[in-house]
């Protein structure tokens, strides 16, 4: 299995267990699922809760909540959404830091070139739809953390996450 960590904070962000789709040679998108966590009421197969007197909350959600699978699996956190102009400044600073980190780690020249050439195209795509995104960050809430952008596909039902490909580092486990 391959875990992808934020290149600046070291936070685990995503793994190859998800189907990563490359966009514009710089972004990765992955479809997510809403899962229910909390208030696990474990019942044995074949058990009859009403006969056991355990159907008091039948149909109730209790303390269960719906979250995105990647948020739960990688301990991602909701992050206050910046105004569009603030985000623009923040993302430009983030891209400079990623570029510096790629150079520091002696990434291949073609990787650095790919990042430089495609960053503006990706940023324009993101800014055009920025109002539709929710934002997550890694577990550390680091100041330099990648903003993971969450939106919904055209069907309005399927959530997906967007990551900066060059802002992730691969670790095999």
Swiss-Prot record:
Main localization (coarse): cytoplasm
Source lineage: Eukaryota, Fungi, Dikarya, Ascomycota, Pezizomycotina
GO molecular function: calcium ion binding
Subcellular location: Cytoplasm, Cytoskeleton
One annotated Gene Ontology cellular component of this protein: microtubule
UniProt KW Protein biosynthesis keyword: yes
Family affiliation: Belongs to the TCTP family.
Domain TCTP: 1-173
One Pfam family matching this protein: TCTP
Segments forming a coiled coil: none
Keyword Metal-binding: no
Protein name: Translationally-controlled tumor protein homolog
Function: Involved in protein synthesis. Involved in microtubule stabilization.
PANTHER family the record matches: TRANSLATIONALLY CONTROLLED TUMOR PROTEIN-RELATED, TRANSLATIONALLY-CONTROLLED TUMOR PROTEIN
Gene Ontology terms describing biological process: translation
Keywords attached to this entry: Cytoplasm, Cytoskeleton, Microtubule, Protein biosynthesis
